[in-house]
UniProtKB/Swiss-Prot annotation:
The gene is PPP1R35. It holds the Pfam family PPP1R35_C. It is found in: Cytoplasm, Cytoskeleton, Microtubule organizing center, Centrosome; Cytoplasm, Cytoskeleton, Microtubule organizing center, Centrosome, Centriole. Interacts with PPP1CA; this interaction mediates the PPP1CA phosphatase activity inhibition. Interacts with RTTN; this interaction allows the mutual recruitment to the centriole. The lineage of its organism: Eukaryota, Metazoa, Chordata, Craniata, Vertebrata. Its main location: cytoplasm. This is Protein phosphatase 1 regulatory subunit 35. Belongs to the PPP1R35 family. Changing residue 79 to A: Does not affect centriole localization. Does not affect interaction with RTTN. Changing residue 47 to A: Does not affect centrosome localization. Does not affect interaction with RTTN. Keywords: Cytoplasm, Cytoskeleton, Phosphoprotein, Protein phosphatase inhibitor.
Length: 253
């Protein structure tokens, strides 16, 4: 009896496990590409629902519910494709169509020929042609401006020619000019002083005074017992020191 019960329980458990085990999972559906354009990359990602493993011991109802959830989770598993946008295909530049060379037009030099004939028949004015060429030429104008500026900016002391250049050079003038230049370079010599003339007679000093008007006064003391008078110097201004000397020099001049 114990063996039979054990076998029946094993068979029932095996039957429940066989009923709980689902069939094989469905194959993922791969989308078919319509255009044969190669894609730059595919992102193959699975999004399974994480289920924590639980032990098998428990009631048969719980085992059956767990098996159904596993089968539903397996059915919900699918492959997801994330397609990046296709890269723009660079169009290769088409080869340029060879163009035909332009052909010369008939009678294209007719106007030039007429101008040449008119120039040949007209009178040639050399002065006018030179003036026009000088006015149009940039190099000639620049050269003239440089020469004019050099002539205007040179100081008079450095000018080479002060007068017109003559072919008939006078020898005496050239030699005299060279001699003057050499003498100007020599150091100045000490000159002898000029002889002085003998001085003339001096002026008469009695012109400024009259001898008849000169008087001399002296004190006359009649009282006895007075002390004798002492002479006292009277101060004079300092500018009168050389007054007589300056007066004599002025008279000599």
């Amino acid at each position: 009896m114990m063996m039979g019960c054990g076998e029946s329980e094993l068979k029932s458990a095996d039957g429940e496990e066989a009923a709980a085990v689902p069939g094989p999972p469905p194959e993922p559906q791969v989308p078919q590409l319509r255009a044969p354009v190669p894609e730059p990359g595919l992102d193959l990602s699975l999004s399974p629902r994480p289920d924590s493993p639980q032990p098998r011991h428990g009631s048969p109802g719980r085992r059956k519910g767990r098996a159904e959830r596993r089968g539903a989770a397996r059915q919900r598993r699918q492959v997801r494709f994330r397609l990046t946008p296709p890269s723009p295909v660079r169009s290769e530049p088409q080869p340029a169509v060879p163009q035909e060379l332009e052909m010369p037009v008939l009678k294209s030099s007719l106007a030039l020929g007429l101008e040449l004939r008119a120039a040949a028949g007209s009178h040639f004015d050399a002065a006018k042609a030179v003036e026009e060429q000088l006015r149009k030429s940039f190099q000639i104008r620049c050269g003239l401006e440089e020469s004019v500026s050099e002539g205007l900016n040179v100081p008079r002391s450095k000018r080479l020619f002060r007068d017109l250049v003559s072919l008939q050079v006078p020898e005496e003038q050239v030699l005299n000019a060279a001699l003057r230049e050499k003498l100007a370079l020599l150091p100045p010599q000490a000159r002898a002083p000029h002889p002085k003339e003998p001085p003339g007679p001096g002026p008469d000093m009695t012109i400024l005074c009259d001898p008849e008007t000169l008087f001399y006064e002296s004190p006359h003391l009649t009282l006895d017992g007075l002390p004798p008078l002492r002479l006292q110097l009277r101060p004079r201004p300092s500018e009168d020191t050389f007054l007589m000397h300056r007066t004599l020099r002025r008279w000599e001049a």
